Amino acid sequence: MKASPHRPTKALIHLGAIRQNIQQMGAHIPQGTLKWAVVKANAYGHGAVAVAKAIQDDVDGFCVSNIDEAIELRQAGLSKPILILGVSEIEAVALAKEYDFTLTVAGLEWIQALLDKEVDLTGLTVHLKIDSGMGRIGFREVSEVEQAQDLLQKHGVCVEGIFTHFATADEESDDYFNAQLERFKTILASMKEVPELVHASNSATTLWHVETIFNAVRMGDAMYGLNPSGAVLDLPYDLIPALTLESALVHVKTVPAGACMGYGATYQADSEQVIATVPIGYADGWTRDMQNFSVLVDGQACPIVGRVSMDQITIRLPKLYPLGTKVTLIGSNGDKEITATQVATYRVTINYEVVCLLSDRIPREYY
């Protein structure tokens, strides 16, 4: 989707806030711990290349979801190590070697498929993924882990790391987290040779389970100033939200009682009202279920009336405002603030999804 810079709708990204969040997290983890910045999904909607360039001196490497995201970073001139967290296509091995990426290996079948195709693995670097209870990808038995390690090393692969991912690190109960941790530790203790890099800490683990950090952490949601638990757990220290979502009034009118708004005529004015149009809609990631949520104009909460359209929303104003008046959808306006977590709560989802859904049609502006 092509960006629309000639619209007033934009996402403002505070790169300094991201750097401060990295420094804040770094100050609360053991000295010498490697810091990997997770910039998958366009850096959680913040812009992968711009974010990675801004923080490259603050981190030891980057994590992405797939090889195309990794290629984007290399082609932008970023030289730090890049770990691809997902399972890559067999055909991607040559690209991984060419661009010096680190691949995730999650199963013996994948390795065997490479060997069956006689793919040259010499010089490839990998991390082994352990499924300690997340249930998506990874080895579950130590015998499989050691078999994979032996096969890979026999064919010239550098098995640099081993990692897992926790399913409930951002929840109040530690029971399942501790069970996963023990399973991961058991596998490590049973291995004849543990790879150099061992990491299990995502943002939530880094924040609330610092005592369980191995020798590297993966900084994701929290790096962007978001609370991984939403509103379930309090942050142990301050983080600065890096993203503000803004637009402006493009049409303002006074309507009589009985006037209807939007598809389905789901809103009807019960009195004379001031209604304004804002150019953002579900094609931008401001989803259709946001009817009745409020945005901020002149420091005041103004409800979205009528259904969210593909490109526009209508809001009710307390009075007439001139065209071009700023509208804040996420961020501060006057003495009020709307957070990504508040948007997520209204949608019955998580703040990760709110920022990741902001489409490429919204220009990102950096400061």
UniProtKB/Swiss-Prot annotation:
It holds the Pfam family Ala_racemase_C. GO terms for biological process: D-alanine biosynthetic process; peptidoglycan biosynthetic process. Pathway: Amino-acid biosynthesis; D-alanine biosynthesis; D-alanine from L-alanine: step 1/1. This is Alanine racemase. It catalyses: L-alanine = D-alanine. Its EC number is 5.1.1.1. GO terms for cellular component: cytosol. Catalyzes the interconversion of L-alanine and D-alanine. May also act on other amino acids. The keyword Isomerase applies. Substrate binds at residues 136, 310. Keywords: Isomerase, Pyridoxal phosphate. The modification N6-(pyridoxal phosphate)lysine is found at residue 40. Belongs to the alanine racemase family. One of its GO terms (molecular function) is pyridoxal phosphate binding. The active site is at 40 (proton acceptor), 263 (proton acceptor). Its cofactor is pyridoxal 5'-phosphate. SMART domains: Ala_racemase_C (SM01005). The keyword Nucleotide-binding does not apply.
